Amino acid sequence: MEQTSTVAAIATPNAAGGIGIVRISGGDAIAVADKVFSAVSGKPLSEAAGYSAHFGTVSLDGKPIDEAIALVFRAPKSYTGEDTVEFSCHGGVYIVRQVLRAVLNAGAQPAGPGEFTKRAFLNGRIDLAKAESVMSLISAQGEQAASVAFNTIEGRLSGRIESVAHSIINVCAHLSAWVDYPDEDIEELSTDELEKTFSAAQSELESLISGFENGKAVTQGVDTVIVGRPNVGKSTLMNLLSGCERSIVTDVPGTTRDIVEQTVRVGENLLRLADTAGIRDTDNKIESIGVELAKKRLSRAELVIAVFDGAQKLTDEDMEIIDFCSGRRSLAVVNKSDLGFVCNTDYIKSRFGAYVELSAKTAQGGGELEKVLSDLLGTSNFDPSAAALTSERQRNCCVRALDSIKEARSALESGVTLDAVNVCADCAVDALLELTGERAGEAVVNEVFSQFCVGK
């Protein structure tokens, strides 16, 4: 995974703005920049100190195209750990692209997605967990999500993972020495000592995994489907949560046929929301297709919001939806509170773990919906200042480590040889160090950075 070329990319959004930034990184970054940049001081950037700024002009094919400020960073004290130059120029889309073109013509190669952060990882500036959180911070859509990502960048998650890993590594090293050098005077670890270490590691990993599940609604969003029979107010609720008219609302049953999707934020809860066709038996071919799509979409939902018309008695279609939600993470919304309730709300309450009454039309009850959602998703007790897992990859590493720790404890309890216990413990270490990147293969690293945008 060695990086030898000098790369460049636009580091700001592809839109007009106050400034645009073109970033260059690599062994020849300063030499490339000198080919296109002329400082008003008359001195080349090759003579510049690190952490210095220089005003001048950028030229393309010998013709000045913009004024810019060149920021020079010397290895290893840069974001990537390499020599880096950043041109801050005027933020017009055309101008920024021309500056990049000049840099590429001067010898730099186009940077791939996340390549600058990938180089920071490969050069030891950050670990893999911190690298992932850079993208999490960029994509954060709420205060808590941003706080979690920043705390991970600051190293809180890595600190917790490394603490667990090192405690197990110490055990593995001692067990290996005791097994491999029986003639040496190496004290055997007692079963109680091993159990204490493994138990503490298991508790910490279970806490991290639990925190991920509770914080998922904050950091990643929850795949959520709104379901109900026709004309109970599903689309009105979708529009209320979206803050705009995403779904068509009429008095005609069966208006919604396609699945309408929108990512919305309810308080600090991020929902990947889907409004589906009203579920009912129908002879309309197009509507029936929409109903089937709704049922398929429901099958993979992480959260179901079941909407009922409070102004009408429960129907067979309502009962079918109630039965479907049994055993699933679901929230009952009894809508049209502004019209007064006729339906059996006590029965609905008895069938759902979470329940709220509101008027999607007037937004009455919206605050209660936010509170109930937070309780249901576990975000009401979520502490964004604590170290937290921020990706499925990190969670999977912790789950694998936890499984190995449980196997080690089971082996210890059954009285097998300590070298067998050591094998299980070492598997846990492998999983934890894969999380931080110390033992991550090239395929894992490439997958992480493929999700980044170009320029970061």
Where do the language-model regions lie?
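Generic preference for hydrophobic
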Residues: A70, P110, T224-I226, V249, ...
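Conserved beta-strand segments of alpha/beta enzyme cores
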Residues: Q109, L270-R272, A354
